[in-house]
Structure formats: C-alpha cells, structure tokens
Amino acid sequence: MNNNILLTAVGGDLSCSILKCLKESGLLLKVIGTDVNSNIAGKWLVDKFIISPEAVNEDEYKKFISDIYKEEEVSIIIPASESEVMFFQSHRDYFDCKNIKVLIVNQQAYDAFADKYITTISLNEFGIRTPVTYLSQEFKKELQYPFILKSRTGSGSNSVEIIHNDDEYEFYKERTKDPIVQEFLDSDEEFTTAIYSDGNTVEVFSFKRVLGPGGMTFIADVVEENALLEISNVIAERVSLKGSINIQTKRLGGAFIPFEINMRLSSTVYMRHHFGFCDAVWWVNNVLTGSIGDKGKYRSSGTAYRVNDYLFR
C-alpha cells in the first residue's frame, strides 16, 4: 500500500503518538503534517510540513484542506486537534461529496457524545450510570461541595475545575464556556478505555491509569474488566460505532462510572499500540481498503510509563 496521509496539529502530543503508530505499522506511507505554528518539533518528524490556517476560520481552512488534498494527492486526513475534529464533523457532507476521506467517527456517535451534557443523557438512556449532571443555568445547588465544573465541549482537563465553595463556583462559572456542573466522583481508581469498531466487530482495550500534570496519563496498567467490556459493547451497539472513541471511568463502590467520552483517537494511542491494540492503524486501513487488516492479538497485561523526550536540530 502506498498512500499519502495528511496529519494535522503535528505540534501536539496526540499527533506525535499517532505518527509513531503509523511509522511502526509497516504501511508504506508518506506523512504530510500541518500545524498553525511552525516552530515545533513535529515538523521534523513528518515527511513534509505545511503551515495551516486555524480551523475556526472556516472558509480559509476549507480551501486550504481542499487544495492540499489535491496537490499532495492525499489518501486520508487525520485531524488531531479538537477544533479540527469539530470542523470536519460540521462539514462532513462537503468532504463526502468531494470523496475526501477523513478519520472521524460516524455521525450518530458524534451526536451522542460530542456534547458532555448530551453525553450523560445518552448514556442514561442506554442504561449506563453517570455522574449527576446539570446545566449551570439550571443548577440550584442540588450537589454538595466539592463538585465538578467544566465546559460542555472540548476534551482533556484544561477546562475542568473541582469546586469547593460558592466563591469558587461564581469565579469559574464566569470563566468557563457553556459550563455544566457534575457530581464529583471521589475515587482514585481511574480507567481509560479505547473502543474501536469497523461497524461489524468491536474491539476494547483498557488501562488503569495514574495522571500527571495537565491531566496526562503518566502510568498505565493494562487491565481486563468485564464491566468495562460490557459498557463498551453497549455504547458501540447503541451508536452503531464506526471509528475509535475513548471513555474515561472511575470505579466507585464497585461500579464503573463513565464521566468523559472523547470522539477521536486519544493520547494513549501509542501506549495501547505497543501492546498490540493498533486502533489508529486499523482505522486507517479500514477507511482506505474497507478492512482493518491483520488484527493479531493484543496483550492482557503490562505497564506503560510516560517519559519526556527531546529533539535536537
């Protein structure tokens, strides 16, 4: 297979992890990287780097993507920033009409989980327990302190605050876009689970993780939990999942409670790739060929540790 891959946001941690997966896949690929910044390490890791406009400038970004797709004979686009994932989801019909292939989840899954408030409603409808959640404007102090305040959109922990009193609530509420209030799950047992489906089979892989600064996974232990497998299969079935998503759960009182779902490849993608769960490669293969290829076996035990690295020029 000889294909050109367009990978966005190569200045970010996620893109670098995806790039490692692709390079170890054995596929014959040329990776063209884009980013809004040029002074980044990622541009030295790809075969060709092109500076990109911001996705929020929709008309300019749409033209940029259309032009580069044609000029570079791109086979597939992998968006790796939240704003770019949102852009491609919003313009799905446009790119479908042009037969431009993009690595994004199916519309039904995106509609169910892109909004964090809608996520809790969707999961409850599926019979899955979630933290009690309110829109900020409807919240009447039904929850005791501490509780969580976060934005309805986006991923990661940048817009997540633990609120301990009225002053903190008023302060962060005014500084958070589209805030929601959520029950605080008082547990140190946190798990991250990748769910991949090609529309026929469902693959599930979980880590029990320890978080470091910025909410990044610093230590990840491979685990097999039947309850997480059951939750994942219900989610995949109910949204007819096509693609890879990531659910974050805490174990509280013996129950696994999802509190976040990310609608893209997650930052632990290379960790699980190392253990044989190669969802980034499977997804690319499936979009390009209609098959995930040789899945092989993935490991049921092991530990990953995150370390810092440097690139010198």
Model-derived regions: residue spans:
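ATP-dependent carboxylate/phosphate-activation module, predominantly the ATP-grasp catalytic core
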Residues: 183-190, 194-244, 251, 262-289, ...
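Peripheral (often C-terminal) accessory segments that flank ATP-dependent C-N-forming ligase machineries
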Residues: 282-313
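Residues that mark the start of a beta-strand
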Residues: 2-6, 146, 192
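Active-site nucleotide/adenylate-binding loops and adjacent lid/helix of ATP-dependent enzymes
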Residues: 109-188, 197-200, 226
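ATP-binding N-terminal substructure of ATP-dependent carboxylate-amine bond-forming enzymes
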Residues: 1-103
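Conserved protein kinase catalytic/activation segment
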Residues: 255-256
